[in-house]
């Protein structure tokens, strides 16, 4: 423990479970995983704070309403339940939203959970089969690793799953950190019922430079409201930046004017591990037999954890994978000679 556990994304993220459809592979992995979370829901302890609150994708105008309709068709084609809401129906469901929004797409299967406790529960479920050793790793070589104290350990397989820090052990991985700001309010039970996301979120989520903000709000089971989101490249500074937070809050107030009177109790930052195509690397390193990669989940690590784990396990043990693993294989960026593909 101690100094070697650097800012895990699990502890600082939003814990949203969202079916994202930027491409078919992202939707396949997120939808499969959300269904897995849903089957675990009955067994999750209360401290995991799982809620099947659903998401409302908000359309501010006619152009965003057209985007909502495109999204509806993509989700339905993949078997994900969803429905369009007109302006009046949206007002009924979430009266705190500003008047004048064009409508929304409701995705009832989406949810939220408190990821650190869910991760702890998953580890505990493994029971005595899992031996935990907390130590800093300074080098990996195939299925061998060297600890900071100089000892080498070897195994049949080594899985690298350390997010933005993966590049420190494997320099050729195409992972860039994307900084995000988050804020949580005091308790205001009953203010929000669904997770709210603006349809402009997608263009913010995939901007490849600069700083972008998009409105994202979540009702926590405590009655608190969780606010995001911002994205910044080319910084590793964990400090909360006033101007970015201010932009994010202005965006939130644009959608939820009533928030102006609410107390914010804490703001913090985290880093997402972004890949060039927005999909994680799940599979064996083509140049290092025995080294398996599970990195690059960007903002969907909690959502896609179950599917990612099952895809990796199926490859490791030669079983039939639940989804086509091809889109996530590291070969799309890494060559068998060990260098990054141009």
Task: Label the model's feature ranges.
Residues 1-11:
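Glycine-rich FAD pyrophosphate-binding loop
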Residues 14-93, 214, 251-253:
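Dinucleotide-binding Rossmann-like beta1-alpha1 core, especially the glycine-rich loop
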Residues 15-17, 48-50, 152, 157, ...:
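Active-site substrate-recognition segment that forms the wall
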Residues 28, 58-67, 106-124, 239-244, ...:
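Short beta-strand to alpha-helix junction loop
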Residues 47-57, 82-87, 91-125, 230-234, ...:
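Helix-loop-beta segment of a Rossmann-like dinucleotide-binding subdomain
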Residues 86-87, 133-135, 266:
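Short loop/edge segments at beta-strand edges and connector loops
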Residues 105-143, 148, 153-156:
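Helical element adjacent to the flavin cofactor pocket in flavoenzyme catalytic cores
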Residues 247, 253-342:
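C-terminal catalytic lobe of FAD-dependent flavoproteins
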């Amino acid at each position: 423990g101690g100094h070697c556990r650097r800012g895990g994304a699990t502890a600082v993220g939003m814990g949203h479970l969202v079916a994202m459809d930027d491409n078919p592979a992202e939707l396949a992995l997120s939808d499969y995983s959300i269904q897995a979370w849903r089957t675990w829901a009955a067994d999750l302890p209360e401290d995991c704070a799982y809620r099947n609150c659903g998401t409302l994708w908000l359309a501010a105008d006619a152009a965003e309403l057209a985007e909502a309709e495109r999204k509806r068709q993509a989700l339905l084609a993949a078997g994900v339940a969803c429905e369009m809401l007109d302006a009046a129906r949206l007002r009924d469901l979430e009266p705190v939203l500003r008047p004048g929004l064009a409508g929304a797409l409701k995705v009832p299967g989406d949810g939220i959970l408190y990821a650190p406790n869910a991760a702890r529960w998953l580890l505990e479920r493994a029971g005595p089969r899992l031996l935990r050793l907390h130590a800093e790793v300074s080098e990996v070589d195939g299925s061998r690793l060297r600890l900071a104290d100089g000892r080498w350990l070897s195994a049949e397989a080594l899985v690298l799953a350390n997010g933005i820090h993966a590049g420190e052990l494997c320099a050729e991985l195409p992972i860039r950190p994307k900084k995000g700001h988050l804020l949580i309010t005091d308790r205001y039970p009953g203010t929000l019922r669904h997770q709210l996301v603006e349809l402009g979120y997608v263009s913010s989520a995939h901007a490849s430079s600069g700083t972008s903000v998009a409105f994202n709000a979540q009702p926590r089971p405590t009655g608190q409201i969780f606010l995001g989101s911002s994205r910044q490249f080319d910084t590793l500074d964990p400090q909360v930046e006033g101007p970015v937070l201010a932009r994010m809050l202005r965006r939130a107030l644009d959608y939820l004017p009533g928030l102006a009177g609410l107390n914010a109790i804490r703001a913090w930052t985290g880093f997402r591990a972004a890949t060039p195509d927005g999909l994680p690397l799940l599979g064996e390193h083509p140049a290092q037999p025995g080294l398996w990669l599970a990195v690059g989940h960007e903002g969907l690590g909690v959502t896609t954890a179950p599917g990612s784990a099952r895809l990796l396990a199926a490859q490791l043990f030669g079983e039939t994978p639940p989804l086509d693993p091809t889109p996530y294989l590291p070969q799309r960026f890494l060559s068998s000679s060990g260098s990054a593909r141009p």
